[in-house]
Every structure is written in structure tokens, then in C-alpha cells.
Amino acid sequence: MRVKKGDLVEVIAGKDRGKRGKVLRVIPREDRVIVEGINIVHRHMRPTPDMPQGGIVKNEAPIHISNVMLVCPNCDEKTRIGATYLEDGQKVRKCKKCDEVVDK
């Protein structure tokens, strides 16, 4: 997967199209990511010892990886990602638009 935890992504399809958020969790087995503030669902929680009152809780639900694009930290545009190798042999991700390295 080309998106990692902590990356800034933009939603390109679905009800939250155009919104940006930080990746909180990547689920590679299901090709899904959980993005902060995106795909909010309401869970009706029964009272438990942890939450004695119960109620409606808002959580982020996973969104398919094909519905998000990485936002390049250098050019601040949504972009596709390519891979390249540095002089020391380390594989890094790079922006296809500005050709800069995305990884820290």
C-alpha cells in the first residue's frame, strides 16, 4: 500500500469527497484506511460499566484505499505516488507531480 499511517490524504469519491484528513490506521488485508474526520458513523451504544449512560457515539469508519489520494507535503496537491531509490539504497516514495521525496 502506498499510503501510510500519518499521511495527509484527500477523499476523491463518496460522501466526503474533497475533504482532507490524516490517516489514523491502515488495514492492508482489507485495502482500507481510517481517516480522521472522514466517513463518520453513529454507533448506538448500550450502557456498560465503562460508559454507564450509553448513547450515540460518533466514530470514523474505514474507507477503501481507492477512494483516497495522498496529498504531497511539498506541493500541497493530491497526487499519485511513485517509488525511487536514494543513493544509499533506501526505497522512498516520491510525488509524481513535483518529483520530490514524500517520506521524511
From Swiss-Prot:
Organism field: Halothermothrix orenii (strain H 168 / OCM 544 / DSM 9562)
Matches recorded under Pfam families: KOW, ribosomal_L24
Protein name from the UniProt record: Large ribosomal subunit protein uL24
Keyword vocabulary terms for this entry: Ribonucleoprotein, Ribosomal protein, RNA-binding, rRNA-binding
GO cellular component: ribonucleoprotein complex; ribosome
InterPro entries on file: KOW, Rib_uL2_dom2, Ribosomal_uL24, Ribosomal_uL24_CS, Ribosomal_uL24_KOW, Translation_prot_SH3-like_sf
Transmembrane segment boundaries: none
SUPFAM superfamilies: Translation proteins SH3-like domain (SSF50104)
Record GO terms (molecular function): rRNA binding; structural constituent of ribosome
Name of the encoding gene: rplX
Protein family according to the UniProt entry: Belongs to the universal ribosomal protein uL24 family.
Lineage top rank: taxon: Bacteria
Known function: One of two assembly initiator proteins, it binds directly to the 5'-end of the 23S rRNA, where it nucleates assembly of the 50S subunit.
Phylogenetic placement of the source organism: Bacteria, Bacillati, Bacillota, Clostridia, Halanaerobiales
Gene Ontology terms: biological process: translation
Subunit and partners: Part of the 50S ribosomal subunit.
Record-linked PANTHER family: MITOCHONDRIAL RIBOSOMAL PROTEIN L24
